[in-house]
Amino acid sequence: MKSTRILLQNDTILHIGIDDTDSPKGMCTTFLSYKIVKFLEKQEIQFMDFPSLIRFNPNIPWKTRGNGAVRLTIKTKNPKKIKNKITQFVASYSDTKNGANPGLVFYQNKKIPASFHKFSKLALWKLISRKQAKQFVSENSIESFYLGNGQGLVGAISAVGYEFFDHTFELLCYRKKSQFGKKRSISKDSVKNMQSTTFPETFSSYDIENDRVLITPHGPDPVFYGVRGETIKSVIRASTIVNSDEKLDGYMVFKSNQGTGDHLNNELQVDDLK
């Protein structure tokens, strides 16, 4: 028992926030997180929750796609090694040559301070400047890393501070690098079948009125398709119904605020856009 207590005392809870690693021409913060998770699975760490995909203010004019940031929470005995490696991932994979401004935040503690939660709540509906984010990092002595203008720090801080009062799940499938930028080939009938079979446990999969598949993005990013649903079981089941000939790199399930309506808790004021 004595050795077990010492082991637990040496464990560190590490919250990791990542944002703005992508550009309109490529990359995706969730794909980078998928790569990081694959690395972490080979380390002596424990995941404390599902990877979290949090979508913030949808009205941000400079957002790339869904304005989503990612949080990972782990328990580790070697936080320094983990932080160094994740920083390398962000520096190497971010599409900075095409305008990405990645931000990365680390917070070591089981309890997230109220200041993080407040920052995150504002990010759901307000425009928060990178200057405010850098000031927050400085005033709270937060470990961080950024490239470009540092806009990604806003989402990274907000991801760490986000509190789930409701959640859904999102299963994202990723393409192999050789397929990036190529047309996505997916069976429309299988997506129709998936929706009719799994709805309402899954949602936003197929637009019946306009006869349009909703689960596939249209840009050159690594995502092949994404299924949103109420439970882990429902999104995994749905993915087994979707048919495609393309060989995929893999998939990851995120805990998400998609479809929860938490962006609607505040009315956007015109003055906030000035």
Spans of model-derived segments:
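Short, intrinsically disordered low-complexity segments
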Residues: 46-80
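Long, hydrophobic alpha/beta structural blocks
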Residues: 84-266
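Short amphipathic alpha-helical segments
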Residues: 28-32, 78-85
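OB-fold and OB-like beta-barrel modules that bind single-stranded nucleic acids
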Residues: 270-274
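Non-catalytic accessory regions used for complex assembly or targeting
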Residues: 2-4
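Short cationic amphipathic helices and targeting signals
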Residues: 16, 68-76, 103-109
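N-terminal ordered "arm"
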Residues: 10-55, 64
